[in-house]
Amino acid sequence: MLRSSLLPFSYLYEKIINFRNTLYDKGFLKIKKLPVPVISVGNLSVGGSGKTSFVMYLADLLKDKRVCILSRGYKRKSKGTLIVSEYGNLKVSWEEAGDEPYLMAKLLPHVSVVASEDRYKGGLLALEKLSPEVFILDDGFQHRKLHRDLNILLLKKKDLKDRLLPAGNLREPLKEIRRADALVLTYQEVEPFEFFTGKPTFKMFREFCCLLNSDFEEVPFDILKEREVIAFSGLGDNGQFRKVLKNLGIKVKEFMSFPDHYDYSDFTPEEGEIYLTTPKDLIKLQGYENVFALNFKVKLEREEKLKKLIYRIFY
């Protein structure tokens, strides 16, 4: 009811967004181009949609290239342009990098990660210092000032019936799907859905394979056998994590929900308990022997078709 009362502000927000997009469409706002291919991965809504997972999946698909991920580094405790990692060599802490860029840098030793509010400037620094062959623009759908050679848009089921901010969670109207070159329908393992536009469309599934301990070493699921866990997450959509735990049959005696990008500075695990969270949250809680993250691999239907779509930009 409270968010419905914000509908007049959503109408105003829509006018502002439409005006901004028109300025880009008509060429009144300049779009800058980097000299190597750029693949943008983004979404239409605030909150979790699987962007970070898909970016890491994409980086693995491009293993034969020198990949650099360009990220804003949301809520990081630094400003400007920052090299987070150089092909596996971590340069900064998670606080300086932001949790998502740091997680990608930690789990992807074959790529480089750069954080910058201005992704074009980040790209220029990367070209000077890292010699990448391709950029992946993380959360790039609304960052229209940078040219992209392939524009991939992630959608989750909730997006299709949501409202614009602040009455809902959409950052742009659904009609802006027109700008996407390809669509990825996420969270199919918990909320399967179909969506047809005539654009290349792929379904994304998460396949849960193991646990990670606080050193990010793989641990078998067996440690949870006959145990109840305290689960928690600080994501854009904590409800998705709860659904995953339920679908996997994990016994949860308590679930704690924190805001997205929560820093856990006031969090102390109790001895004798087992805690289960996500990799993004775990990077802020290293050193605890009883805190684990649920790890998964991303699977895409028609992966070969996606590969062909991606590799066309290099020729």
From Swiss-Prot:
A Pfam family (short name) is LpxK
Q: Provide this UniProt record's keywords sorted from A to Z.
A: ATP-binding, Kinase, Lipid A biosynthesis, Lipid biosynthesis, Lipid metabolism, Nucleotide-binding, Transferase
The terms under GO molecular function for this entry are:
ATP binding; tetraacyldisaccharide 4'-kinase activity
Q: Which residue windows are coiled coil?
A: none
Detail which positions bind ATP.
45-52
UniProt record similarity statement: Belongs to the LpxK family.
Family matches, as HAMAP family: LpxK (MF_00409)
InterPro entries the record matches: LpxK, P-loop_NTPase
Domain of life, source organism: Bacteria
What is the name listed in the Swiss-Prot or TrEMBL entry for this protein?
Answer: Tetraacyldisaccharide 4'-kinase
Any one GO CC term of this protein is: plasma membrane
- Species assigned in the record: Aquifex aeolicus (strain VF5)
What does the protein in this record do? Transfers the gamma-phosphate of ATP to the 4'-position of a tetraacyldisaccharide 1-phosphate intermediate (termed DS-1-P) to form tetraacyldisaccharide 1,4'-bis-phosphate (lipid IVA).
EC number assigned by the record: 2.7.1.130
Q: Which reaction does it catalyse?
A: a lipid A disaccharide + ATP = a lipid IVA + ADP + H(+)
Tell me a GO biological process for this protein.
Answer: lipopolysaccharide core region biosynthetic process
Under NCBIfam families, the record lists: lpxK
Pathway in which this enzyme or protein is active? Glycolipid biosynthesis; lipid IV(A) biosynthesis; lipid IV(A) from (3R)-3-hydroxytetradecanoyl-[acyl-carrier-protein] and UDP-N-acetyl-alpha-D-glucosamine: step 6/6
KW Lipid metabolism (keyword) present: yes
Enzyme class of the recorded protein, top EC level: transferase
